[in-house]
Design a protein with these regions (language model features):
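Perimembrane helix-loop-helix junctions
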Residues: 3, 180-207, 277-279
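Membrane-interface alpha helices of multi-pass inner-membrane proteins
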Residues: 148-149, 161-175, 180-186, 207-211
């Protein structure tokens, strides 16, 4: 293991120890308050696994049954509490996602300071590591992000098998994986024969997604459900346009995602030169990240305030690792200044001290 890799893992270890020691650890009931209806749905799927759920579940949640169902089977085989098992898998997934990102950045020969900054930006984001440790039932989000990172890496390596593996993982976790297929189609239409995917591969990607979706549809069609599927999907796409909200309410709604993306924006001002949108080669990879991230962030916005609410922060953060990778590998960086470097780390530590997801309470008065 070379010096840069050792340093990266040492920094990751230090950051994670700090988070593990200072994080909130909600019990089941608390996690439902701060994690929303998704967690209850996933728990019920696990509870009744290997059989079908007897409790009503929202169809859109039931379609993501695969991993909660698998966790339920594992919990019964090894006699481990479902909630505890989810938290164990959250720890594992956080480490795995970090490993993928470190290995990916090392391929680009990224300066050690910027690898450290990337680990800080990822893990001190209160809506990434802290959130999922505190609310472990929303594990499907982490699995989705892992799958998207695998797809990003596959495009860099031009590895089709790896891409389909990542797509399957993401599709089993969330219907949002459709964004991966659309992004690939977009690249193919733009680049035509200059893209290593042919139209058959694009068709296969949509077929894979559709097959996984139909598995979820089959599960959700054989259990009691809350609400109707058509109504949920209609609101998912058109919710924002059928709401009657004041300008102030909508303004606050659109500001919420900045609670997750704030440090990344500040990083851009502090460490990236003026040619912000300069793309260094890897056109396919960069187009994919841009289209994918746009679709992922746009979807919870379309749902509207009544459905998404503060969940817009969590749902928009599904694109956070992809955007982080884009900003680390592309724009030309400013020369590292020790004061600026330490100032930013301090800022991220403060930003990470979320009064809900950490043991720190000094930011309680600025919650909104």
């Amino acid at each position: 293991m070379n010096y840069k890799k050792k340093l990266s893992y040492s920094c990751l270890f230090t950051i994670l120890i700090f988070i593990f020691l200072s994080n909130s650890y909600f019990n089941f009931e608390e996690s439902l308050i701060f994690g929303g209806a998704d967690g209850k749905s996933y728990f019920d799927i696990s509870k009744y696994s290997p059989y079908l759920s007897k409790d009503p579940i929202q169809p859109i949640h039931a379609e993501r049954f695969f991993f909660p169902y698998l966790i339920g089977i594992i919990s019964k085989i090894f006699f481990v509490d479902i909630y505890t098992l989810n938290r164990i898998f959250v720890f594992f997934l956080i480490i795995l996602i970090n490993k993928y990102i470190i290995d990916f950045l090392l391929k680009f020969n990224i300066d050690k300071h910027f690898i450290i900054l990337s680990l800080i930006l990822l893990n001190l984001n209160p809506y990434f590591t802290r959130y999922y440790i505190a609310v472990p039932l929303i594990i499907n989000d982490l699995i989705f992000m892992l799958g998207s990172i695998i797809c990003i890496n596959s495009l860099d390596e031009k590895n089709k098998k790896q891409f389909f593996f990542g797509l399957i993982i993401s599709s089993l976790a969330r219907q949002s994986a459709l964004a991966i297929c659309i992004s690939i189609l977009f690249i193919k239409v733009i680049k035509k024969n200059n893209f290593f995917f042919n139209y058959r591969d694009v068709l296969i990607s949509f077929t894979v997604f559709l097959f996984v979706y139909l598995m979820g549809y089959l599960y959700s069609s054989n259990i009691p459900i809350e609400g109707t599927r058509s109504e949920q999907y209609f609101i998912t796409i058109f919710g924002l346009f059928i709401e009657n909200k004041s300008f102030k309410e909508l303004l606050v709604y659109f500001i919420w995602p900045f609670l997750s993306y704030g440090p990344l924006i500040i990083y851009s001002f502090l460490f990236i030169k003026k040619n912000f949108l300069q793309i260094k080669g890897k056109i396919d990879l960069n187009i994919f990240i841009i289209i994918f991230s746009f679709l992922i962030i746009f979807q919870p916005i379309l749902q509207g305030l009544e459905v998404s609410g503060k969940n817009i922060i969590r749902l928009s953060t599904l694109a956070y690792p992809a955007i982080l990778i884009f900003l680390i590998i592309n724009p030309e960086k400013k020369k590292i200044n020790k004061f600026r470097f330490l100032f930013f780390i301090t800022l991220c530590l403060i930003w990470s001290s979320h009064p809900t997801f950490s043991i720190f309470s000094f930011l309680e008065k600025v919650k909104f």
